[in-house]
Every structure is written in structure tokens, then in C-alpha cells.
């Protein structure tokens, strides 16, 4: 068995973790990035050109570890039909990618969620508008009124209420962005808090360097495209809030779609009242785990060796092989 993943997003971490656990590794993707994984950071034993070289991956007896880039490039329907063994529950993809199903899931988990506006004409306070699909924050924008919404939505091709299926309009909750990363072991039945990050976004994290008057004169609009990730260590008194939220999400997934296992992330904010408000779930490894290739403060508290989320995936696959339970982890 070899561990394979698409050459983008968090592939360096996934492949490094797999090699640390003794697996042979395979990266696949565009030819331009081959040196990144074989020369500059030699974590891939094999590199295959192509978005999804199914026959070659089957010949390698590979298990694909999904990332956001892989799902975004192939699309949910193709991933659901792929023949190469897939680490995780494919049924989760529909629930993650459909914002109405995602909300049903998070509501069942009894998480505090922002209000959703079905009609832009009902906007009565600050909102954040998000196009559907994983795009790393690309296309997000803020609006404060129905008029402001329609003016800014045009750049996304949303010109009438018939186009609203392309976006979700969320209450903008003021607070500190926090992205806790979890790992649920299906073999051990345990949830682990792996790490926490916040996103470094363009131009949201740079716009504060421009005085307000110049922002208005220049007509600058805020954008939330992710360019990197910054590690966070939470106040210890907040950890149980985060962990309990993760436990409830796993329990709800068991009832709705047959389970969620492996890595996932709850994307949210802590308000000034220290309330954890969740606005999204990423049901796979997220790029926010990349600062922790050598482990995080939380994994060092649990393990006495460096464990990244990528390595934790490989540890689970290795345990599955050793216990003859690998089939329980794959779909």
C-alpha cells in the first residue's frame, strides 16, 4: 500500500507524515509542481502528472488522502465515483459542499451558528456573502444593506434573486477568527484536538494599514482570499468549548451520514463574550495544519514525538493495516 495525495494544499505535510510512518508516497498533479515534491522538498517517492491518474494509482495500490484542492479540482461527483480507495467517508462530501445540508448538520450538533438571510432585502445589519464551494475565501465580501449587497454581488454574477443559489448570506459575527483542527480516530473511537490557526487573508489583513479616508477615496473593497496561516494557542479555559463542539459534530455525523473520521476543522470566531460561533466545517485536512509539520503544543501534550495531522493520518492507516481493519477507514 502507498499513500497518495494531490500535489497542492497540504500535500507536503501528508506525504512527510506518511514517510515518517514508513509508507511509500505518491503525489499527482500538474508537471510544474513536480520539483516541489521531489527536489526542493523530497517527500514524494513517485510523481504522476494528471488531476486524477486513476489507472496509475490503482497499479500503485494507493490510498488517496483527500484535501480541499483535490475535491475542488475534481468535483464531488467524480470523487464519489473514483475507484481508488479513499481515506474517509465520501458521504460527508455532499454534506460539506451543500451549505443547506452543512447547516442541518451543524444545527443537529447544537452549535451556535450565524443567522442566514434567504432574501437580501431582509439584510438589517452587517453580513458576509460567500460563494458556494471551497475557494479559500475567494469572492467573499461584506455588505451592510440590501443596496450594498446588490452593488457588490454583481462582480460574482449575481444580478437577480434567481442567481442567489450561487451564494450564502451570513450574519457577520464580530469576534476573533479561530480554526481548531481535529482528528477523530475511527479505530480508537477518540477525538483529538490537533492544533489551531487563523488565516492570513488578502486584503483583509492588509487593509488596516491604509487610513480610512484613503480607503474611501481609493474605493478599496475588502477581500478574504487566504494566502497563509498563523498558529494560535487558545486560552486554556476555552479548550473545552472547542473540544465539546468537535465531539457533537462527530456524533451528529454518525446519525446523519454514517460517520466522520479522520481530520476536520470547525471554522468560527470567539466573540467578546467568549462564545464560540461556528460558520463552517471542513470535513478533511485543512491548510491551517501546515504550520505544525513538527507537531503542535496540543499534540506534544498527547504524544512524546512530533505528530502533524498528516502523520496522524498515516498512523491511523498503519494501525488499520496492523489490526487488519484498513477496510473500515476507506470508501
Curated annotation (Swiss-Prot):
Highest taxon, organism lineage: Archaea
Root EC class: ligase
Biological processes per GO annotation: 'de novo' IMP biosynthetic process
Positions with a binding annotation for Mg(2+): 267, 280
UniProt-annotated binding residues for ATP: 120-179, 201
Obligatory cofactor(s): Mg(2+); Mn(2+)
Pfam families: DUF1246 (PF06849), DUF1297 (PF06973)
Domain ATP-grasp: 76-322
Protein EC: 6.3.4.23
Reactions accelerated catalytically: 5-amino-1-(5-phospho-beta-D-ribosyl)imidazole-4-carboxamide + formate + ATP = 5-formamido-1-(5-phospho-D-ribosyl)imidazole-4-carboxamide + ADP + phosphate
Pathway it works in: Purine metabolism; IMP biosynthesis via de novo pathway; 5-formamido-1-(5-phospho-D-ribosyl)imidazole-4-carboxamide from 5-amino-1-(5-phospho-D-ribosyl)imidazole-4-carboxamide (formate route): step 1/1
Keywords of this entry: ATP-binding, Ligase, Magnesium, Manganese, Metal-binding, Nucleotide-binding, Purine biosynthesis
Amino acids binding 5-amino-1-(5-phospho-beta-D-ribosyl)imidazole-4-carboxamide: 9, 69, 229
A molecular-function term among this protein's GO annotations: ligase activity, forming carbon-nitrogen bonds
Note describing how the cofactor binds: Binds 1 Mg(2+) or Mn(2+) ion per subunit.
Family: Belongs to the phosphohexose mutase family.
HAMAP family xrefs: IMP_biosynth_PurP (MF_01163)
NCBIfam families according to UniProt: PRK13278.1-3 (NF009779)
Role of this protein: Catalyzes the ATP- and formate-dependent formylation of 5-aminoimidazole-4-carboxamide-1-beta-d-ribofuranosyl 5'-monophosphate (AICAR) to 5-formaminoimidazole-4-carboxamide-1-beta-d-ribofuranosyl 5'-monophosphate (FAICAR) in the absence of folates.
The protein's name: 5-formaminoimidazole-4-carboxamide-1-(beta)-D-ribofuranosyl 5'-monophosphate synthetase
The gene coding this protein: purP
Amino acid at each position: 500500500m502507498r499513500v497518495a495525495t494531490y500535489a497542492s494544499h497540504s500535500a507536503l505535510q501528508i506525504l512527510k507524515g506518511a514517510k515518517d510512518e514508513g509508507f511509500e508516497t505518491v503525489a499527482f498533479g500538474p508537471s510544474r509542481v513536480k520539483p516541489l515534491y521531489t527536489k526542493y522538498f523530497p517527500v514524494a517517492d513517485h510523481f504522476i502528472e494528471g488531476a486524477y491518474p486513476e489507472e496509475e494509482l490503482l497499479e500503485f495500490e494507493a490510498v488517496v488522502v483527500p484535501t480541499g484542492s483535490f475535491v475542488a479540482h475534481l468535483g464531488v461527483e467524480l470523487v464519489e465515483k473514483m475507484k481508488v480507495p479513499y481515506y474517509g467517508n465520501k458521504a460527508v462530501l455532499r454534506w460539506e459542499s451543500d451549505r443547506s445540508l452543512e447547516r442541518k448538520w451543524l444545527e443537529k450538533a447544537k452549535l451556535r451558528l450565524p443567522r442566514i438571510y434567504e432574501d437580501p432585502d431582509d439584510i438589517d445589519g452587517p453580513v458576509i456573502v460567500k460563494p458556494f464551494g471551497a475557494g479559500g475565501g475567494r469572492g467573499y465580501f461584506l455588505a451592510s444593506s440590501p443596496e450594498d449587497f446588490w452593488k457588490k454581488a454583481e462582480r460574482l454574477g449575481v444580478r437577480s434573486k434567481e442567481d442567489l443559489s450561487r451564494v450564502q448570506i451570513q450574519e457577520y459575527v464580530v469576534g476573533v477568527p479561530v480554526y481548531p483542527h481535529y482528528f477523530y480516530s475511527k479505530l480508537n473511537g477518540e477525538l483529538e484536538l490537533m492544533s489551531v490557526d487563523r488565516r492570513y487573508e488578502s486584503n483583509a489583513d492588509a487593509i488596516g494599514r491604509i487610513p480610512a479616508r484613503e480607503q474611501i477615496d481609493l474605493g478599496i473593497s475588502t477581500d478574504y482570499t487566504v494566502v497563509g496561516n498563523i498558529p494560535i494557542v487558545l486560552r486554556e479555559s476555552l479548550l473545552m468549548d472547542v473540544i465539546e463542539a468537535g465531539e457533537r459534530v462527530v456524533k451528529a455525523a454518525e446519525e446523519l451520514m454514517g460517520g466522520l473520521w479522520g481530520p476536520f476543522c470547525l471554522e468560527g470566531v470567539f466573540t467578546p463574550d467568549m462564545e464560540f460561533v461556528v460558520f463552517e466545517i471542513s470535513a478533511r485536512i485543512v491548510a491551517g495544519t501546515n504550520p505544525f509539520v513538527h507537531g503542535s503544543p496540543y499534540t506534544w501534550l498527547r504524544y512524546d514525538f512530533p505528530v502533524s495531522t498528516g502523520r496522524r493520518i498515516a498512523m491511523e492507516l498503519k494501525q488499520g493495516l496492523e489490526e487488519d481493519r484498513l477496510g473500515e477507514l476507506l470508501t
